[in-house]
Amino acid sequence: MRDKSGIECLKRAIFLYGAPASGKSTLGKALAERLGLGFVDLDERIVAEAGMSIPEIFKTRGEAAFRDIESKALKEVVSGIIPKLPTSNSTLAVVSLGGGTLLRGENRSLCEENGTVFCIDTPSDDELARRIGAAPGSRPLGDKAKERAAHYASFPNRVAAFFDAQSSLVVVGRGIAPAILAGRNVVADETVARLWAGRLGISPFAIIPSGEEHKTPVAVAKLWRAFSERGLGRKDTVVALGGGVTGDLTGFAAATWMRGISWINVPTTLLSMVDASTGGKTGCDLPDGKNLAGAFHFPKLVVIDTDFLETLSPKLISDGRAEMIKHEAIGGKGAGVRGRNRPLRVGATLGEATEPSGACAEELGVSTKEIAANLMVKVGIVREDPLETLGRRILLNCGHTVAHAIEKATGYRVSHGEAVAIGCVEEAKIAVRRGLAPASWPEEFAARFAAANLPTSLPGGLSLDELVPLMRGDKKRDGGAVTFALPCGWGDVRGVKIDLSKESL
């Protein structure tokens, strides 16, 4: 909801809505816990009020009577949450609604006037049927999802949710950031602060300069000083609002402040949404290489709000596509990636960021569901090997050994997404030379990146041999050997150890 100036109106409650068995109560409890908010399950309130289960209410009194009880309970819940003050500077509670609560117009108006309604994207029909079948009779109207599809689709704010490793909750949706950020300890990227702070109604207590060149120990020390001046203690939570650099630095500062405080990651670029936001890796760069100082410190909550994509240039959208295509190489062709980019409707052609355009994610060529599906490739691997000790997680490094060397060799003039695209193609060529992939594979792989407007060959004046000394400093080295994650085909990425002091690439 916006006021007449176009500024997001502050919300006082998060209402979760959606089809029966879509996960409203599970998500509500997890979200409230991580935000330190109260949680209300409307169905539980109804059962307590009526003194009988919901199936029993339907059986003995009928649906109309149930809806009356539901409406009364909702009014009581809302009146109990909303303070008798004209304004509130933070979200106060998370409320899980029933699968048909907002069919009544007055209930919908009540929720939209006093909070933000987020409709949970319905799982597949098979998964929905499995969940309903797991507790037969517990959901009297569990078969109404298809019938109500248009009703659920009328809610513009959508969310999907799943867990990363170590109970890190990932929420992907549209329009959820304002409710999460209100009243919190926010660290923001300087560009994001300029474009979004006023619109979100927040005042970041620390600002991080934009750009990989600022991802240094000095920046971490400045954050520690800001944490101290803010008075952050062991029970506090800090929020990172920005791209991958902001998340890495804020997460590392949180990991090391008072031996570890909680943090929430709110990525604002497509690249950080589909890559750095999950997995728990935090850190900073050193003169010898990228991310050499760091820690595994999973955020307790990751909030991916596709509204932030409005301010991205086509170049930054393409940067994010590079990581999505990398995930496709790991998970198999079509794993959460469209075959080609849709036309992009953004304000800038060359710039790094613009004022919010009002375009939704789908108009920008990326959908919320696509981001969630792509992220699941990475999350599935991280769950198996959260601290990179079993070897499985090395697959996520596909293309990155060469990419990091390119970034360092060019003084980070080549963006991370561009470097990943080039690195993936170069490492595909290495796979061919080692007899691990067919000769046609690098060209096919390169075509995928080219379709996303990404470069696929080394920058002028650079050769692979010239990058080898930089690769020897890779953090995944073991003596003189470096483990590459070589792309050998769609769904076929292999960890291969190469001794760069003895072997040619």
For every predicted segment, state its role.
Residues 44-84, 88-112, 142:
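ATP-dependent small-molecule kinase phosphotransfer cores
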